[in-house]
From Swiss-Prot:
Record-level GO BP terms: translation
Protein name: Small ribosomal subunit protein uS17x
PROSITE patterns on file: RIBOSOMAL_S17
Keywords: Cytoplasm, Ribonucleoprotein, Ribosomal protein, RNA-binding, rRNA-binding
Key word RNA-binding present: yes
Gene encoding the protein: RPS11C
Native organism: Arabidopsis thaliana
Family, similarity comment: Belongs to the universal ribosomal protein uS17 family.
Gene3D superfamilies tied to this protein: 2.40.50.1000
Domain of life: Eukaryota
GO terms of molecular function: mRNA binding; rRNA binding; structural constituent of ribosome
Length: 159
């Protein structure tokens, strides 16, 4: 089980902890003392979500959040918050008067499950879900490390 650091007892709502039989299930959410699911949309469930011991009700793989709506990609701009990052999306806006493009960006806060290790500069794919807080409406689905992608910590990488 996860380390109990909160005042309330942390547990997954769909797992019965007092079971006399403990076996690892091979199908999503079946057997064992850990609930996990396949979110679909072509995204694989991370090994850390299946084998890990963390408890996160807002995790799309082990929690009660479903991914629906938009799937976006961007670069992690800030990872200073707990379990939340800022994803920067760069784009070009056409100015009709001058027949030119100008650089613009948008910042999107997204929840990060503890099964991911995200650093600034990493390329992430996020999916829309129900509102998780006042500003957070997206969840991280996949992380591509900064060294593995062509993107970096640069402010604007172009389109």
């Amino acid at each position: 089980m996860a380390e109990q650091t909160e005042k309330a007892f942390l547990k997954q709502p769909k797992v019965f902890l007092s079971s006399k039989i403990s076996g690892k299930g091979k199908r999503p959410g079946k057997g064992g003392n850990r609930f996990w699911k396949n979110i679909g949309l072509g995204f694989k469930t991370p090994r850390e979500a299946i084998d890990g011991a963390y408890i996160d009700s807002k995790c799309p793989f082990t929690g009660t959040v479903s991914i629906r709506g938009r799937i976006l990609a961007g670069t992690c701009h800030s990872a200073k918050m707990q379990r939340t990052i800022i994803v920067r999306r760069n784009y070009l806006h056409f100015v009709k008067k001058y027949q030119r493009y100008e650089k613009r960006h948008s910042n999107i806060p997204a929840h990060v499950s503890p099964c991911f290790r995200v650093k600034e500069g990493d390329h992430v794919i996020i999916g829309q879900c129900r509102p998780l807080s006042k500003t957070v409406r997206f969840n991280v689905l996949k992380v591509i490390p900064a060294g593995a992608s062509a993107f970096g910590k640069k402010a604007f990488t172009g389109v």
